Design a protein with these regions (language model features):
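Cell-wall polysaccharide-cleaving catalytic domain and substrate-binding groove, primarily
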Residues: 1-171
Length: 171
């Protein structure tokens, strides 16, 4: 079964590591380790960051816990057989939301696309040919990113980064 720690380490690199930053035009506003204050204002880590305690082990624990509870657990990551499939869905869920990532996976494997992981989706994922799933899911992600840019032209500046992130996930 897939391992959260391995998936987390790969994802946190994609998110730029444990850094506080704000990118012009990013709808999430200020972020720390990929956690957007605008979308997650009640995350406990903001208290430590606002107090200037960005080197604490507690902050690192809160980051890991955030990603495990809000993304990995929602996609039943520990029950996905192939590490690469779990990592691909997990990384996209961090970028696009857990429901959207699961819905895209459901479309790829042919289960009802309701955005919630369930026994039928899990079974289909675990029976999927790993390489085929990864390629189809990558194409679905790129399509999703293009749709975002078509709806909101201000997001075009992020498109190449999103595509590169998707390509990196193929290796």
């Amino acid at each position: 079964m897939a391992d959260f720690s391995a998936a987390f380490e790969r994802m946190i690199q994609n998110e730029g590591g444990y850094k506080l930053h704000k990118v012009s035009g990013d709808r999430g506003g200020q972020t720390y380790a990929g956690i957007a204050r605008k979308f997650h204002p009640d995350w406990e880590g903001w208290k430590l960051i606002d107090a200037g305690d960005m080197e604490s082990l507690e902050l690192s624990r809160l980051v890991r816990s955030f990603y495990k509870e809000r993304f990995w657990d929602k996609m039943w990551g520990d029950r996905v057989a192939a590490q690469s499939i779990a990592e691909s869905i997990f990384d996209f869920s961090v970028n696009a939301g857990a429901s959207i990532a699961v819905k895209l996976a459901q479309l790829v494997v042919g289960t009802v696309p309701d955005g919630r992981m369930g026994p039928k989706t899990l079974e289909a994922l675990n029976q999927a040919e790993e390489g085929v799933f990864i390629l189809k899911y990558a194409l679905a992600k790129v399509t999703r990113y293009a749709e975002i840019c078509n709806r909101d032209r201000s997001q075009v500046k992020f498109l190449l980064g999103w595509i590169n992130r998707t390509i990196k996930g193929l290796s």
